[in-house]
């Protein structure tokens, strides 16, 4: 079941990739993918290229894939291990969701962080208290790690 679904998603992604994103298997293992997200233009991550890993569980799509950034990023909902705080990767997962939709949700999280549900409270505080400083640091990290 999982393999068929993953193969179908791969075909759909190759046929109609989401804007600013790409993804596909690492080598022959269809349960382990690498994804790329281009920093959205309306964000301090503009110009950056961010790499993520995607690991599908054997009971996919009934359980969400594990998605993590491998590129360092300054963001209140993404920690230094690359873990992403995003409801659809946890409690709000649904088998109707796809990798494509997950990547688009991560893109919109880059543009619109959720400082009220942070993985990195210090960054969330900076985002809320001093948006200019947040944007500056996010741009600096993007230039340092994602370009």
From Swiss-Prot:
Pathway: Protein modification; protein ubiquitination
Enzyme class, spelled out: transferase
Pfam families: UQ_con
GO molecular function: ATP binding; mitogen-activated protein kinase kinase kinase binding; ubiquitin binding; ubiquitin conjugating enzyme activity; ubiquitin-protein transferase activity
Effect of residue 85 to A: Catalytically inactive. No effect on pronephros development
InterPro entries: UBQ-conjugat_E2_core, UBQ-conjugating_AS, UBQ-conjugating_enzyme/RWD
Record key words, sorted: ATP-binding, Developmental protein, Nucleotide-binding, Transferase, Ubl conjugation pathway
Active site annotation, chain numbering: 85 (glycyl thioester intermediate)
GO cellular component, one term: nucleus
GO BP, one annotated term: protein ubiquitination
Protein's job: Catalyzes the covalent attachment of ubiquitin to other proteins. Regulates pronephros development, possibly by promoting ubiquitination and thus inactivation or degradation of map3k10/mlk2.
Similarity annotation: Belongs to the ubiquitin-conjugating enzyme family.
PANTHER family membership: UBIQUITIN-CONJUGATING ENZYME E2
Quaternary structure, from the entry: Interacts with map3k10/mlk2.
Annotated protein name in UniProt: Ubiquitin-conjugating enzyme E2 D4
Organism whose genome encodes this protein: Xenopus laevis (African clawed frog)
